[in-house]
Amino acid sequence: MITLKEALKYSKEELENLKKELNEKAKKEKKIGAYIEQFLDKDLSVSGEGVPVAIKDNISVKGWELTSASKILQGYIAPYDASVIVNLKANGFSPFGRCNMDEFAMGSSTASSYYGKTLNPLNFERVPGGSSGGSAAAVAGGLALASLGSDTGGSVRQPAAFCGCVGFKPSYGRVSRYGLASYSSSLDQIGVLTQNVEDAAILYDAIAGYDKMDSTSANIEFIKTAPNLNANKKLKIAVIENYVNDADSEVKNALLKTIDMLKANGHEIVYKNLLDSKFDIAAYYIIATAEASTNLSRYDGVRYGKRSENIQNLKEMYVNTRSEGFGEEVKRRILLGTFVLSSGYYDAYYIKAQKARAFIKAKYEEILQDCDLIFMPVTPTTAFKFDTQKSPIQTYLEDVYTISVNLAGLGGISVPVAKDKEGLNISAQLICKAYDEQTLLDGALSLEQMIKN
């Protein structure tokens, strides 16, 4: 598979042939489920000119159906382009293909999609991760050069780690959220999934920057990262020792070898500890579900999306539309969020969660005052099997090493470093100071080149 960097040099005719080739391959590999049905039958001319980039089904592309992989949004056609799509088109790229996802980005396996599950290209019995599992599977399976996803608590980095590609979540506010179907507004961030670190920098440069359409967009100077990539920069890296030690034995051993390689290549390694991750999980799922319960209140059958046909009055329209339209996991999170925001529980749960979030952010900032980057696992294990019976709580633990990065609003990247005995991917996670994506990508490129060599 050619890289983004190579494809940007293609002629118009070569790009048209590339899109036809990708579309045919996607149809042939339909069983992977990386794309939802509406892409496979789409007239390729509507994608426009430019290097093709696959798009998660919660990012608005004018004229395309946008469903967030949910029954309740079937038939909704996006009336405008998200800011990231506008930026893509302005920088020589074109949206190409709707990627499958967990419904409303709530999940870690891409098994809750209305369209059916996505398979992991490395092993069809394993989950691709989530919620951007379709975006990761498309890149890892050679069905896309690169893709856009969204990351609320690890939804770009975790599937990238499970599928074996690079997953990069920029700092909160660095990439506009205008046109992203919201899950948790204070945590959501659009990110990129690519074949390598340089492509991640190129695609990030194309979509990043201040946007007046997004009130949470960071109005600070943005300097392109790809032209300034430097894999030879020697960095001070803080290894989160308790997280590495708590990971599965194969993941732990692979990360310890990676740390030794970083030392051997001249990077300074120091060891730090973070809080027990149970505090991250508690704070995250209170804040995220609280915000989700309000964000998803707009899906009521009145303005857009699918309305229940089994209605006699206004109350039945609301109740039946939402009961029939939302999947089980989405309902669970709406109920949890409504509960923690309710009278009598707001102070006991939501306010405490916000205090915990501030404490988590301060701990990261304390470590990064003295270090360039943080190193830790992306996931505690490699990709698990679909038939593994996991309770909702066990599933939430899949994001145990990624959610705190969103709570702190920092940038993070997942880089493949090894394979386990079954050939499944193991990745390392690097984390940077807020808005210091250049250092993050430099460190990731250094790590990637070490592994390849």
UniProtKB/Swiss-Prot annotation:
Its EC number is 6.3.5.7. It comes from the Bacteria. GO terms for biological process: translation. InterPro entries: Amidase, Amidase_CS, Amidase_dom, AS_sf, GatA. Keywords: ATP-binding, Ligase, Nucleotide-binding, Protein biosynthesis. PROSITE patterns: AMIDASES. The keyword Ribosomal protein does not apply. It catalyses: L-glutamyl-tRNA(Gln) + L-glutamine + ATP + H2O = L-glutaminyl-tRNA(Gln) + L-glutamate + ADP + phosphate + H(+). One of its GO terms (cellular component) is glutamyl-tRNA(Gln) amidotransferase complex. GO terms for molecular function: ATP binding; glutaminyl-tRNA synthase (glutamine-hydrolyzing) activity. Pfam families: Amidase. The active site is at residues 56, 131, 155. Heterotrimer of A, B and C subunits. Allows the formation of correctly charged Gln-tRNA(Gln) through the transamidation of misacylated Glu-tRNA(Gln) in organisms which lack glutaminyl-tRNA synthetase. The reaction takes place in the presence of glutamine and ATP through an activated gamma-phospho-Glu-tRNA(Gln). Belongs to the amidase family. GatA subfamily. This is Glutamyl-tRNA(Gln) amidotransferase subunit A. It comes from Campylobacter jejuni (strain RM1221). The gene is gatA.
